[in-house]
Swiss-Prot record:
Record carries keyword Calcium: yes
Any single GO CC term annotated in Swiss-Prot or TrEMBL for this entry: cytoplasm
GO molecular function terms attached to this record: calcium ion binding
Protein name: Parvalbumin beta 3
Keywords of this entry: Allergen, Calcium, Metal-binding, Muscle protein, Repeat
Top-level lineage group: Eukaryota
Species of the source: Macruronus novaezelandiae (Blue grenadier)
């Protein structure tokens, strides 16, 4: 199963890298990562990667959505990655 904490530990984590990753995942350029974008998270980094399961997506969203609006903003994403 997918573990976002392990993924981020393996990835470079400078502030610039984190922001670049955020904007890659934010496919519709809304300034937020929504649930449908989060589901396809791994595919942004590897073309043949699987989609996250509904449970993995919900867990990831809950971990990153500190204000409870159902989306992950750039500041929330940075806090999640740096955790």
């Amino acid at each position: 199963s997918f573990n976002y904490k392990t993924f981020f530990k393996l990835a470079a984590k400078s502030n610039d890298d984190v922001k670049k990753a955020f904007f890659v995942i934010d496919q519709d350029k809304s300034g937020f990562i929504e649930e449908d974008e989060l589901k396809l998270f791994l595919q942004n980094f590897s073309a043949g990667a699987r989609a996250l399961t509904a449970g993995e997506t919900k867990t990831f969203l809950a971990a990153g959505d500190s204000d409870g609006d159902g989306m992950i903003g750039v500041d929330e994403f940075q806090a999640l990655v740096k955790a």
